[in-house]
Amino acid sequence: MRKKRRGFLNASTAVLVGILAGFLGVVLAATGALGFAVRESLLLKQFLFLSFEGNTDGASPFGKDVVVTASQDVAADGEYSLKVENRTSVWDGVEIDLTGKVNTGTDYLLSFHVYQTSDSPQLFSVLARTEDEKGERYKILADKVVVPNYWKEILVPFSPTFEGTPAKFSLIITSPKKTDFVFYVDNVQVLTPKEAGPKVVYETSFEKGIGDWQPRGSDVKISISPKVAHSGKKSLFVSNRQKGWHGAQISLKGILKTGKTYAFEAWVYQESGQDQTIIMTMQRKYSSDSSTKYEWIKAATVPSGQWVQLSGTYTIPAGVTVEDLTLYFESQNPTLEFYVDDVKVVDTTSAEIKLEMNPEEEIPALKDVLKDYFRVGVALPSKVFINQKDIALISKHSNSSTAENEMKPDSLLAGIENGKLKFRFETADKYIEFAQQNGMVVRGHTLVWHNQTPEWFFKDENGNLLSKEEMTERLREYIHTVVGHFKGKVYAWDVVNEAVDPNQPDGLRRSTWYQIMGPDYIELAFKFAREADPNAKLFYNDYNTFEPKKRDIIYNLVKSLKEKGLIDGIGMQCHISLATDIRQIEEAIKKFSTIPGIEIHITELDISVYRDSTSNYSEAPRTALIEQAHKMAQLFKIFKKYSNVITNVTFWGLKDDYSWRATRRNDWPLIFDKDYQAKLAYWAIVAPEVLPPLPKESKISEGEAVVVGMMDDSYMMSKPIEIYDEEGNVKATIRAIWKDSTIYVYGEVQDATKKPAEDGVAIFINPNNERTPYLQPDDTYVVLWTNWKSEVNREDVEVKKFVGPGFRRYSFEMSITIPGVEFKKDSYIGFDVAVIDDGKWYSWSDTTNSQKTNTMNYGTLKLEGVMVATAKYGTPVIDGEIDDIWNTTEEIETKSVAMGSLEKNATAKVRVLWDEENLYVLAIVKDPVLNKDNSNPWEQDSVEIFIDENNHKTGYYEDDDAQFRVNYMNEQSFGTGASAARFKTAVKLIEGGYIVEAAIKWKTIKPSPNTVIGFNVQVNDANEKGQRVGIISWSDPTNNSWRDPSKFGNLRLIK
C-alpha cells in the first residue's frame, strides 16, 4: 500500500502562499490533475491531516442513520478514502471534530477532496458547527458544485469565533440537495499560517514632501498642503485641473514586477460642497500593446469634507515587457480640486492566499450546453491575448466575442489629416485573428455612441461644431471605413448605441450627434452600415431596455427602421442587479419579438451583487451570490423560451476581476471568479437544479384577523408572498400579519384539480430565527388540507383554520398561536410556506421541501408596525390654494431619508383626499433654495407621487401602478404608468418653499370606503448648482419607489 504524503497540501495546480486575510468564508476550489504539493516549509503549516488509510481517522457521521467507513472503492491519493452513505436528511454528512484544536479569531484553511457517484452534478456545502456560551449555531462556509466521478479539491478558509470556551467546534461536509447517492472524502487537511507580513513596495504620507509625484496635464498644480491631512499634518493638493484626466501621478515602472498582484490604498478628500467621484487609475503599456491603456483600480463617491479610502488590486501578467506603469488620481469633474494622502502599494504575494489556478476542464462547455439555442459570447479586453489561462477559458466556453473597448471610436480614430480621418486597426485586428483561430464570430461594438468618441470628431479645424451636412459626410466616411475594413469578418454590428432618453419629448438623447444632426443621424448610420457590408447584421443597442417607457420608445424606433430594411435586431445590454425584476425583461423580449423578422442579442450581460448604488462589500456575501445565480437561472430560462428570436447571449467580461463593475466598487457580476473557477451563476445556466435554495426575505405588518376565510383589511397592510410553479406562474398569493404570540395567514391558491387529501398548504414558523439542520423545540409547523384536516407538530400550539372552495382555486386562513412566544416589532422570525398540489410541494423559501426536518433554508420575516395613513372623502379645487376641506383629513410628513438629512434638505407635510374620480394630494414643501437647472426632472426641486391602486406591493410596476412628478414651476413629468391625461396640478410659491396641489384620475379601480391602496410621496431637493442633494419620502428610505411598489406605504380611503 502506498502511503499518503503527510505535511503537504495537494492543491491541484494551486500555489498557496501567505496568510488567509481577506478570504474568510469564501470557497476557493482548485482543479486539474493531482500531484502538485505545497510544502509545510512555505508560509502555511499543517496541524491536521486525515488520510483514511484503513480507518476513519476520527471523522464521524453527522445524522442519525449516516454510515462512514474507510473504503477502497476510490481514492484521491493512496488506496483508501472515507465513504459516506445512508443519508436520509439533506444535511446529513461527515463531521470533522476540531474542538480544542482551533482558537477564536485565528485564520485557518480546510482542504479536502470529494468524489460523488450520482449521474449529474451535485452541490456540496461545508458547515461550521459551534456550541459555546452563546448556544448552538451553524454557519454555511462554502458551496461548490462537483461533477460525477471526479475528484474535486475544495478549499475553505475559516476563522472561528467563540463566546468563552467552546464545548464543540466542528466542520461538516454534506451535499444538501439530494440524499440518494454515495460520496467519498479524501485528504482532509487543516492548515494555519506561519508568521508572515505584507511587503510594502511603496508608501508615502507626504510628510516629507512631494517626492516623485508629478502634475498630470498642462497647467495642473500639485503641492504639499497643511490644510487637511488623513494622517500626520500634510497631504498632496491637486489644483488648476481643466480635464477629467488631469491630476497627480507617479511612475511605478521598476517598482512593480511582472507576475504579481498588488494591493493599492490611498485616501482622498474634497470640499466642493457636493459629492464627487475620484478615481485611482493605472496608465500602462506593455511591449505587446499597440497603444497605452488606462485601467481604473478604484473609483469612489467622495462626500464633501470627508476622507474616503480608495482600495483595489492590480495584476501585472507574467512574461510581459513593461514600458509604462503610471499610477494617477483623476476625477470626472474636470475642475475639481482634491487632496491625496497615505498612498500605499503592497505586494500581495506575501499578504494573501494566491491561487494560481487553471480553468476547470471537467465542467461542461457553455457553448455546447447552449448550442441548440444561441451563440455564447464574451466581451474581452486586449490583455487576454497574452494570457494562456484566459485563452483556455474563452475557447472552451464561447463561440462569439466582442471587443470591450478596442472597436469603439476613440480606439480606432488616430486623428485627422487634410480633412480625412486617420485610423488605427492593429489592436482591433487581433480580435479578428483570435476569433478565426478559435472558431468564433465577432460582434462589432460600437459605431455611433455619444461616449468614447473624441470631441474633435464633431468639430472643424477651428474648433467649431460641424454643420449637419459636414457631420453627415464624416459619419459616412467613418462607418464606410470601419465597417468596410472588417467586411466579412464582423458578423454583427452595434450600429447605434444608447441613443434613447425616455425623459426627452421625442425619447432621444440630446447628444452631440443629436445637437448637430437631429434624429436623422440614427437612420443615416444604419444606411451607411448597410452600404458598407450588406451581409452584416445591424443592431440598435441600449441599456435598461426592459423599463416600460424606454422599452416602448425603442420598440417604435426599431420597428420603423425594420420596415425600411435598415436594421436586423435589438441589442439588450442587460447590465442588471439583484434589484432588477426579471419579469420586466421577459415583457420587453416578448414585445420586441413581435416586430416581424427581428433578432435579439443579449449584448452585455452581467448581474451586480448589489441592490443599490452605495453599498460596498469587502467580500461577496453568500446570499448575494446565491441570489445572483437564481437571477441568472431565471434569465436563461427566458432566453431559451425565446430562442427563436434570441440568437446571441454575450457576457460583458470573462471573469469577475476583469469586469468594469469591479473598478467602481467591489463587485462579482460574472459567472467565473477571479481564479477562473465556475461560480454558482455558471451552474445556474448548466444545471440550475443544483443551486442552493435562496432563503427569502419579506416583512409583515402588525394586525389581527377573525379566522372566517375572508381577507380582513389588516392583511392588506402586509406585502404579499407569492409561490410559483415550474413555469413561473403564480401558484399562490399569501399575506401574513402578527400580533402578540399569533401569526395570521390568509392565502389564495390556484389548483385546477380537487384532491382534498392531497391538496393543502403548510406553514412553518421558527420564532427565534436560528438556522439548524434539525427542528428546535420552538419550531412550529401546521399542514392544512383542503378537507379541513390538519397536521401540527406540537400539541401545545393553538390553530384556528378555514378553507374556502372556489372554481379551479381555493382560499384558506389560519391563526397559529405559539405559547411562550411574544412577537415584537422590528424583530425577525424564520418562516416558510408551501402549497401542496396532488401531493407535490411548491415552497416559498426552502425549495428542497425539507422544512419538517430542518430550518436551514427558511425565509426571514421582519415584524413591522403598520405604515398606514387615511384619506378623507372630499373634492378640493386644484388651484394652489389650501381649501378648508384639506383640514378634514390626516396630515403625514416625509421623514424616510434616502439622500440628505431631515435637518438640511427639503421635506413636505402632506394631506390626501379622494372621491369617485380622483385621488387628491396637497404637499406643503419646505425648501428655501429652488432650482430646476438639471436636465433630469427627478433632480430638480419637485414632488413625486406614487400610487398602487390594487396594493399588490409587487417588486415591479403593474398596470395599476404609476409615478407622477411636478416641479416647483408646475412642470410635469412622468414615470412608469403615468400620463398627463390623468394628472392635474397647481403650484404656488410661498416663503421658504412651495405648495403643490394635484388630482390623479383613478385608472383601474372604483374606490369605496375602506379601500386600501399603496401610496408614497417624495420630495426631491436640488441645490443652487442644480445637483440633487436630498431625497426624502413618506415610506421609502431606499429611493426605489420609481421601480418597486413594494416600498409604498398604505393609504386607507375613509368617509
Curated annotation (Swiss-Prot):
It comes from the Bacteria. Optimum temperature is 102 degrees Celsius. Thermostable. It catalyses: Endohydrolysis of (1->4)-beta-D-xylosidic linkages in xylans. SMART domains: Glyco_10. Belongs to the glycosyl hydrolase 10 (cellulase F) family. Transmembrane segments: none annotated. Optimum pH is 5.5-6. One of its GO terms (biological process) is xylan catabolic process. The active site is at 498 (proton donor), 604 (nucleophile). Keywords: Carbohydrate metabolism, Glycosidase, Hydrolase, Polysaccharide degradation, Repeat, Signal, Xylan degradation. The C-terminal CBM-CenC domains mediate the binding of XynA to microcrystalline cellulose. CBM-CenC 2 alone can also promote cellulose binding. Its EC number is 3.2.1.8. Residues 30-357 are annotated as: A. Residues 1-29 form the signal peptide. One of its GO terms (molecular function) is carbohydrate binding. Residues 720-851, 895-1040 form the CBM-cenC domain. This is Endo-1,4-beta-xylanase A. Residues 360-688 form the GH10 domain. It is an enzyme of class 3 (hydrolase).
